[in-house]
Curated annotation (Swiss-Prot):
The active site is at residue 45. The record marks 84 as: Increases basicity of active site His. GO terms for cellular component: cytoplasm. Its cofactor is a divalent metal cation. The record marks 70 as: Transition state stabilizer. Transmembrane segments: none annotated. It catalyses: 4-hydroxy-2-oxoheptanedioate = succinate semialdehyde + pyruvate. NCBIfam families: HpaI. SUPFAM superfamilies: Phosphoenolpyruvate/pyruvate domain. This is 4-hydroxy-2-oxo-heptane-1,7-dioate aldolase. Keywords: Aromatic hydrocarbons catabolism, Lyase, Metal-binding. InterPro entries: Aldolase/citrate-lyase_domain, HKHD_aldolase_ent, HpaI, HpcH-HpaI_aldolase, Pyrv/PenolPyrv_kinase-like_dom, Pyrv_kinase-like_dom_sf.
Length: 267
């Protein structure tokens, strides 16, 4: 039950990831094969639920790629269910301050360190109580990544970084750019300056900085600055753009021209 993704972040080894939004165990297993270090199962913007997350965790399990799960919200009940089906690494969206970061951490810990309910006899996470001392070991293997996606969260970043149990901080460039007044343009110089400053600040605090960006040049720039978990693509976008390009090569250029309008997108 060792969380190798958490261990890699702690050791300072950069982890390259891919975003999963197709909500399919079949495509999740397909994408566990190319060699990405981690795969993000998105429960915030993709049509996932606990059952679909479970099937994707099962599909990814035989492969080296490590699953990270994003719940729809910083909700202890939802987090409890995701942990019980086997999630060990969570990416918690829209964390605005230290109190919300503490709430996320406490939701992943059994008492007295937190509020996670004990139901290991029913849980895939404990292999239905077949893992010896699971209740004693589980807390240390939980990896909590919190998302900062607004100017308020950026302002509160020093306090968020002080929260014990926060392993990493993920900068959400799409929502951050919108909050800064540059919706759809995360590559705006002001947004980029804020992102770069945050990456350095997070790393200096001994936490792991993370981000999603499909622009290869920017992804490499963030890695140079010290980002440790970087998602470099999204399954839905990869499929859509490849299909559009194939159609265009056979004379249908309408869909590919529409895609070209979104060159500044995170995805």
């Amino acid at each position: 039950m060792e969380n190798s993704f958490k261990a890699a972040l702690k050791a300072g080894r950069p982890q390259i990831g891919l975003w999963l939004g197709l909500s399919s165990s079949y495509s999740a297993e397909l994408l566990a094969g190319p060699g990405f270090d981690w795969l993000l199962i998105d429960g915030e913007h993709a049509p996932n639920n606990v059952q679909t997350v479970l099937t994707q965790l099962q599909a990814i399990a035989p492969y080296p790629s490590q699953p990270v799960v994003r719940p729809s919200w910083n909700d202890p009940v939802q987090i409890k269910q995701l942990l019980d089906v086997g999630t060990q690494t969570l990416l918690v969206p829209m964390v605005q301050n230290a109190d919300e970061a503490r709430k996320a951490v406490r939701a992943t810990r059994y008492p007295p360190a937190g509020i996670r309910g004990v139901g290991s006899a029913l849980a895939r996470a404990s292999r239905w109580n077949r893992i010896p001392d699971y209740l004693q070991k589980a807390n240390d293997q939980m990896c909590v990544l919190v998302q900062i996606e607004t100017r308020e969260a950026m302002k509160n970043l020093p306090q968020i970084l002080d929260v014990e149990g926060v392993d990493g901080v993920f900068i959400g460039p799409a929502d951050l750019s919108a909050d800064m007044g540059y919706a759809g343009n995360p590559q705006h110089p002001e947004v980029q300056a804020a992102i770069e400053q945050a990456i350095v600040q997070i790393r200096e605090a001994g936490k792991a900085p993370g981000i999603l960006i499909a622009n290869e040049q920017l992804a490499k720039r963030y890695l140079e600055l010290g980002a440790l978990f970087v998602a470099v693509g999204v399954d839905t976008t990869l499929l859509a753009r490849a299909a559009e390009a194939l159609a265009a090569r056979f004379g249908n250029s309408s869909s590919i021209s529409m895609a070209k309008q979104n060159n500044n997108s995170v995805y």
